[in-house]
A protein has these predicted regions:
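Polybasic, proline/glycine-rich intrinsically disordered low-complexity segments
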Residues: 54-115
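Glycine-rich, aromatic-bearing surface loops/beta-hairpins
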Residues: 131-178
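N-terminal interaction modules that seed assembly of large macromolecular complexes
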Residues: 23-64
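Short N-terminal edge-element motif at the start of the domain
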Residues: 1-30
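A short, structural micro-pattern
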Residues: 27, 67, 138-140
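Charge-rich, solvent-exposed alpha-helical interaction surfaces
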Residues: 11, 15, 19, 91, ...
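Alpha-helix boundary/N-cap detector
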Residues: 3, 7, 11, 83, ...
């Protein structure tokens, strides 16, 4: 890990850990837990879905059975989109802003390096969270899809999903997004 990556990755890890732990206090059974960022690699937030939240969403919105899989993994429809962002991600925002002031956005090579570093920091954080066992709270880990996802999604989401999860455990997600 590079010296530039470590502080950013650790800050994202700490913020996401606090947000996920607070969220998991509700005792619901989670199957979707992600860090989200934009195609510009802005500061990430978390999003999550639980079995119980999906059931409430489907019932409240009269979602037809055949459409449920599309909502099941939709960060935009998640009631837990950006959960804990204001409370826990302020240091992350500050670090990103500090890095922004050092970047020449007209220099494509410099921007690509920064973009890749930011995504690597997010992947580092989600892997570190996984290693702590956090995604096994309230449900077995193999039932939880984890990832660093982009808004809007792109093919790199699939690559990261396969590196962070057992492909057998995310068959449904893969059938929708690949």
């Amino acid at each position: 890990m590079t010296p530039e990556l470590q502080p950013l990755g650790d800050a994202i890890f700490e913020a996401a850990k606090k947000a996920f732990l607070k969220l998991f206090e509700n005792g619901e059974h989670y199957y979707y837990c992600v860090l989200l960022t934009t195609g510009e690699a802005l500061p990430p937030c978390i999003a999550a879905w639980s079995v119980e939240a999906l059931e409430r969403f489907v019932n409240e919105n009269a979602i037809p059975q055949e459409e449920i899989p599309y909502y099941k993994y939709s960060f935009a429809d998640s009631p837990y989109y950006a959960f804990g962002y204001e409370e826990y991600f302020q240091q992350v925002k500050q670090l990103f802003e500090e890095r922004d002031s050092l970047i020449d956005y007209n220099n494509e090579e410099q921007w690509n390096e920064e973009y890749n570093l930011r995504l690597a920091a997010m992947v580092y954080a989600i892997k570190k969270l996984d290693e702590t066992g956090i995604f096994a709270f309230n449900q077995p880990r193999e039932q939880v899809y984890i990832n660093v996802e982009l808004m809007p999604p792109d093919d790199t989401d699939i690559e990261r999903a396969l590196s962070l999860n057992n492909s057998e455990d995310i068959k449904e997600w893969l059938s929708i997004f690949s």
